[in-house]
């Protein structure tokens, strides 16, 4: 599409800016629109993630530049494939490893999110993720000076979903990581 390179460069530029510099500004924005605290505190955690990040766009663009050649696209067009068919029959199946790798990266990032969860869900412990609950549990157990076995068990239990997800999708995860290696 026209302007694709400018759009891509703007996305790459946003990756150069530190996320911490925008944390407070983002928080103020979400406070002003009423998305902080209670069940609405989940919205700033979910809605921005639906649109991907600059890193995701860069990753997928790099993958598709190397995996989807112009010859394949031209051959599909000659065979009568329209844009929708080209996307669903060729681009999506070719991009499955990269898309699944991005899903895994996003899931692990959201699962391990601590500061954003604490910032937006501070007053509703029923909505906390496992990492916030684990932090509070270890804080409570530290008061008694001991309970190291319980802390380690809680940390291990919090890692189990990620370990199971990794082993279940290891093939796609490794393929997605190897995407950046390039083809010689």
Outline where the language-model segments fall.
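A structural signal for multi-pass alpha-helical bundles of membrane permease subunits
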Residues: 1-184
